[in-house]
Amino acid sequence: MTQRERQILKWIEENPLISQQELADKAGIARSSVAVHISNLMKQGHIAGKGYIVRTAPYVVVVGGVNLDIGGRPHGELVAADSNPGQVRMSLGGVGRNIAHNMALMGLDVRMLTAFGDDMNAQRIAASCGELGIDISQCLTVPGGATSTYLFITDGHGDMALAVSDMEIYEHVTPAFLAGRARLLQNAQLLVVDTNIPAQSIAWLAENIRLPIFADPVSTAKAEKLRPVLGKLHTLKPNRLEAELLSGVSITDAASLNAAADALLATACGGYSSVWGATGCSPPTTAGGYTCPAVPERW
């Protein structure tokens, strides 16, 4: 399904009686083009015949962070307490948003639950999500709030040296907010959660939503939020430091990595994938494990 087809299907889901001309006006394209898109959607099985009877397709819900990322990388070695010539870029990020982005690129139907501020950054993120086909219609906008912003600096090799995050907006992703979207959550195929949201909200999801839950710890400071619910997770994706924290095992080599994995799997967590930065990732499960090399980042 193309991005345009996702957009048209979303409008049809919102208003099954909408006309082709109305769809054309909303999309800024010719009515004949809309007819072609609708024909394609019917062939793909998303629309069942005339009258825009929409089939309920499987979808994924992501609950977590959506940020404006500001990153700096020096041309050479990073020098502390000094101005470093280098490159600065702004991009859309957030662990949850990044996961949703990649799933949308894979053609999955993705619904996002998060909190936005009432600012231009939120508008920029919303526009990007619309282009990607990520549904943010159930998200919360906080009047007067500031959309989450993440500022980071890497060393000359691209590995993060330090970061500052302004993410107070996520305190609004409360259990009450999630309970108001329980139907959306319960009807999904799986749930992805990151630890940018409050610990009590993660606990509420683990206790009340009967879905496979995939969790990203985000950072060592936030990973502790997952400790009480480890046994209710389908899959956990920590980096080395987060895996050490949650497993209690110091990871220095492949053997200690496997020991950490065994400790986490013993909690009844169904799967585990440890990310080793530039080295790649190692996803052991109860059925065994293997290592995937990392794809170099391009600046």
What annotation goes with each model-predicted range?
Residues S39, K43-L78:
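Positively charged, low-complexity intrinsically disordered leader regions
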Residues V61, R111, V192, F214-A215, ...:
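Structural detector of well-ordered beta-strand residues that form the stable sheet scaffold
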